[in-house]
A protein has these predicted regions:
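Structural signature of tandem alpha-helical TPR/SEL1-like repeats
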Residues: 48-57, 79-92, 114-126, 131, ...
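Short coil turns that delineate tetratricopeptide repeat
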Residues: 33, 64, 98, 131-132, ...
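Position-specific recognition of the canonical hydrophobic site in helix A of tetratricopeptide repeat
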Residues: 47, 71, 75-78, 95, ...
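Long, contiguous interaction/recruitment modules in multidomain scaffold/adaptor proteins
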Residues: 2-37, 48
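Canonical tetratricopeptide repeat
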Residues: 41, 72-75, 106, 139, ...
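Terminal, low-structured helical/coil segments at or just beyond the last alpha-helical repeat
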Residues: 21-36, 180, 184-187, 197, ...
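Alpha-helical segment of the N-proximal tetratricopeptide repeat
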Residues: 34-82, 109
Length: 250
């Protein structure tokens, strides 16, 4: 994570970005493609190139619209910050496929962006009844975190980490960044992340987030000194050095 702000992830469906990248690569080859690209595939290429308005026009011109296509149109509008349009197309997707976890998750991200965190939580939980997804659990945790429900947030983040040990390290499809969180709240998030990694024995990452939370002015160093999750870390030179360092707020 670069600055490691908390993020909400949009869902396009399994392997969508990989497929789009493969199509982009195909267009760069010297030999012509074995078959003409469909409108949906052309739209996927435009999405991969961040040409969202052009992607919308291309998807819209496809007469064979299905739930996946409506979800993709919603994502394109979402990337353009046209949240109401995005929500309309996500809802169209759910009408066609009521168990469409990705579209339900994305409706949740719209409500999250509008700071309607309770509704976002409701949609994330609906999505999780269908799909046991690490990224949706992470989104759920972020929504709880925004409501300062830290116990529930930590539980959801733990569920995400259990399903994907690197969920917080390789998330590339960012949606709405939680930029309205203050430094104190970011410090709390990084403390919780450090604790989860320490509990799983991933000491290098745990130390990284201990450092981050202290740099952001985490006020309760006593927790770091006493929480049982950090017991193995407390014997390391790196941890001792971090604890001896004077706190400074970035």
């Amino acid at each position: 994570m670069v600055s490691r702000l908390i993020a909400v992830v949009l869902s396009a469906g399994a392997c969508c970005s990989a497929t789009a990248q493969a199509l982009v690569d195909q267009t760069r080859q010297q030999t012509p493609p074995t078959r003409p690209l469909t409108l949906e595939e052309r739209g996927d290429i435009l999405m991969a190139r961040k040409m969202y308005r052009e992607a919308i026009d291309t998807f819209q011109s496809d007469k064979n619209k299905n739930a996946v296509l409506y979800n993709k149109i919603g994502i394109a509008y979402h990337q353009l910050q046209q949240l109401d349009n995005a929500k309309k197309f996500y809802e169209q997707a759910v009408k066609l496929k009521r168990d469409y976890a990705e579209a339900l998750n994305n409706i949740g991200t719209v409500y999250y962006a509008k700071k309607s965190y309770r509704r976002a939580i409701g949609y994330y939980r609906r999505a999780l009844r269908i799909s046991d997804s690490a990224s949706i659990y992470s989104n759920l945790g972020t929504a709880y975190f925004a409501r300062k429900q830290y116990i529930e947030a930590t539980k959801a983040y733990q569920e995400a980490l259990d399903r994907d040990p690197d969920v917080f390290e390789h998330r590339s499809n960012y949606g709405t960044l939680l930029q309205d969180r203050n430094v104190e709240e970011r410090a709390r998030f990084h403390y919780e992340l450090a604790k989860m990694y320490a509990q799983k024995g991933r000491n290098e990452l745990a130390l990284q987030y201990v450092r981050k939370c202290l740099e952001e002015g985490f006020k309760d160093k006593k927790k770091l000194a006493e929480d049982p999750e950090f017991q193995s870390l407390r014997e390391t030179d790196e941890f001792k050095q971090l604890m001896a360092t004077e706190q400074r707020v970035l």
